[in-house]
Amino acid sequence: ECWSQAADCSDGHCCAGRSFSKNCRPYGGD
């Protein structure tokens, strides 16, 4: 599950912002 204002990416990352393809980050980035 992703944080607030984030969406799941098919590659298992969380995306924030509108340009999801440019803002993908790994889950739980410390």
UniProtKB/Swiss-Prot annotation:
Cysteine-cysteine disulfides: C2-C15, C9-C24
GO CC annotation terms, alphabetical: extracellular region
Primary localization: secreted
GO molecular function ontology, one term from the record: toxin activity
Family: Belongs to the AVIT (prokineticin) family.
The name this protein goes by in its record: Hainantoxin F6-34.84
UniProt organism field: Cyriopagopus hainanus (Chinese bird spider)
Subcellular location(s) of the protein: Secreted
Keywords of this entry: Disulfide bond, Secreted, Toxin
Tissue expression summary: Expressed by the venom gland.
